[in-house]
Every structure is written in C-alpha cells, then in structure tokens.
C-alpha cells in the first residue's frame, strides 16, 4: 500500500509559461537577417550535461559582449517544460527558441548538442563548434567576430 501511494501520479504539473517560441529554418534565417551585428547561436537541451556545464559561459559572455554580439539559444530534442526549467535555472537573458524537429540546426551542420554557431554580421557562418565549448575557445571566436 505504501508503494502504491508513493508511485501515484498526483496532480499534473503546472504548465510552464511562457513556452519558448517555435522556430523553423525560414524563421531562423529571417531572424539572422534582421540582426545588424554578429551572432553566436548556442544549440542546447535541458537533459544535456555538457549543455548545463557551458551555460554559465554563455551567460558571462552575453553580459560582457551583448552590445556588440547577438546571442541566441535554440532548444533541440527537448520538452517545453524542460527548456523553461533550464532557462530559469541558468538565468540566460538572451532570446531562446524551440526547434522541435531539428530542421533549423540540420541546415547548418554539426553533431548533437551542445553545438555553437558563429555568424558574421552578414549572416555568414564562420565556425561551428561541436560539443561543450570552453572559455578559451569561446573567447577566441568572440574576438574573431569582433575583429572582422
């Protein structure tokens, strides 16, 4: 009887609001075209341990460089609930989008998550980083974007 009570479903969880806006390839390309500055796009998922490890690096980089570089996040292969909890936990202040079927990131290549894309102010992809990024690599590519 105790086991049954402990395994009960109870009340359904509260919905996570607001949900991340969904984005597809056309919407992503339009978003990039509207930016007048270089962009760093981090692809992540809430269940991804390396994504969780690198999140503070992106928070710090955004704080330091948000006047000169646009930061965007794309949640991939995840739930809206997991995504919102991840963003709340890491307090990532830049825009994030939900790519439910992966079409946006498939266009730009790379493997798995995390993945980070570096775009010039003219929307040219200059570097794709697969896997967790470290501080030195992130700083190197930020410098490349700023000095183009």
Where are these regions (language model features)?
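C-terminal motif of bacterial Sec signal peptides marking the signal peptidase cleavage site
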Residues: 3-6
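Bacterial lipoprotein signal-peptidase II cleavage site
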Residues: 8-16
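A short beta-strand-turn-helix
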Residues: 19-38
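Short pre-active-site segment immediately N-terminal to redox-active cysteine/selenocysteine motifs
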Residues: 36-39, 44-47, 112
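Hydrophobic beta-strand anchors of alpha/beta hydrolase catalytic cores
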Residues: 40-41, 71, 116
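C-type cytochrome heme c attachment motif
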Residues: 46-53, 115
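Structural microenvironment flanking redox-active thiols in thiol-disulfide oxidoreductases
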Residues: 52-90, 100-106
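Thiol/disulfide oxidoreductase modules built on the thioredoxin-like
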Residues: 86-93, 100-146
